[in-house]
Amino acid sequence: MHELSIAHNIVNIASAAAAEAGTEEISAVYLRIGALAGVVADALRFSFAIAAEGTPLANAELIIEEVPVTVFCPTCNTEVTLPNPRLFRCPHCGRPCGQIIHGRELELVALETP
């Protein structure tokens, strides 16, 4: 379960940012996680609650934006969002697509203070 190590890294980064900003508490952490990032959102939420205990993030809400897979279709010459991220075929023309534009993200976007 690598979500626990990810949660610890989020807590470390956010705690350092809180200390640098001179705040003692973080109320929310905003993340963007791509469908291909290999992260289970519920497992990350559970792990985050454990990792945040005793830190400025102890009462913080973890807000996750799930990013769908977007690829470039060379046949249609456009970016398309895949309805099924396991099939890398353009939903318009059915041809294979290989260039991933979005969907691998794992980004800490913002921190919110009370």
Swiss-Prot record:
GO terms for biological process: protein maturation; protein modification process. Coiled coil: none annotated. This is Hydrogenase maturation factor HypA. It comes from the Bacteria. The keyword Metal-binding applies. It comes from Chloroflexus aggregans (strain MD-66 / DSM 9485). Zn(2+) binds at C73, C76, C90, C93. Keywords: Metal-binding, Nickel, Zinc. Belongs to the HypA/HybF family. Ni(2+) binds at H2. The keyword Cell division does not apply. Gene3D superfamilies: 3.30.2320.80. Signal peptide: none annotated. GO terms for molecular function: nickel cation binding; zinc ion binding. InterPro entries: Hydgase_Ni_incorp_HypA/HybF_CS (IPR020538), HypA/HybF (IPR000688). Pfam families: HypA.
